[in-house]
Amino acid sequence: MATKGIYYTLVTQLDKLARHNRQGSFRTKDRYYEAVKRFCAYLAAHYHLQKLENVSGKHLVSYVLYLQEQGKSASTVKTDLSAIRFFHDKMSHPRYTLPGNEELGVALERRRFGQQDRTWTNSEFGKLIGRAMAEEREEYILALYLARYAGLRIHECFRMDTAAAERALRENALTVKGKGGKVRIVPIEDDRITMMLERLLDKTERGHKLLVPDGVPTDRAINGMQQFIIRHRDTICDPTAPDRRITFHGLRHTYAAEKYTSLVSGGMTPLDAHFTVSRLLGHERPDVTDIYLASVKGGSVRGE
């Protein structure tokens, strides 16, 4: 069944649940319905899931990461999760019990659009690399390098297979298929990426994913990376900033800020630098890129 057909099938199931719902105000009902309708579109496009009763924790984790990539606030993400659980509770025979927010293993941190500095310090990054080395997690080391020095999203890192890695080494550039199937080219500008690509290629069977062990679902491998950061976060973050909560996605912010600063320092105009960073990140909307450049004064396309 085509994605569009699957989507309509899921919405039909949602409509049946909604018709029998007598709880909540009209506003809440509408808000929850629209939230789960968007979730249906995601399930159809990314999982080809045909029954809402088969929704599980892995779908929630994946969807949360997707919403965060879209720049959605923590309150919006939490409301959407509440909506999904609300309708899940209305199902007669759900296959799985959905985990709570604390059990997802994904940080639902507070975000203030275009204001919050989410970049990592060199010390924080170096310490986490050290932890990954100590635990011999070479796949985590490569993922961290790809995010920090090439701006890749976490799912873009874990999607990489041997063919993509070989092409990157040949061309000295990463060909990245991002959200919506949009392809972008990101030059490899740090030798450590090349080094780790070569090391993992030597250990990975041809045709397999570089950062995902055989037999392990990709979403579980991604969750493992998230948990690794959460586990070590308190020991690597600045102790004078107890509320600081670094995330993998913050490395993308670090890449954007450092790239923008480097381009402007090299003589490029702020406007041109902004659009260059936007293209490298795989974004088209200036306001979204502004979020990534929150730590850089003048990083806005408007020159604010």
Residue ranges, per PLM feature:
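Catalytic-site neighborhood detector that most strongly recognizes the C-terminal catalytic loop/helix
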Residues: 180, 279-304
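DNA breakage-rejoining catalytic core of tyrosine-based enzymes
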Residues: 110-127, 181-191, 205-208
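N-terminal DNA-binding module of tyrosine recombinases/phage integrases
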Residues: 1-23
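C-terminal catalytic core of tyrosine-transesterase DNA break-rejoin enzymes
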Residues: 145, 250-287
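Active-site/catalytic core of tyrosine-dependent DNA strand-transfer enzymes
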Residues: 189-245, 249-255, 261-262
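Conserved tyrosine-mediated DNA breakage-rejoining catalytic core shared by Y-recombinases
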Residues: 159-196
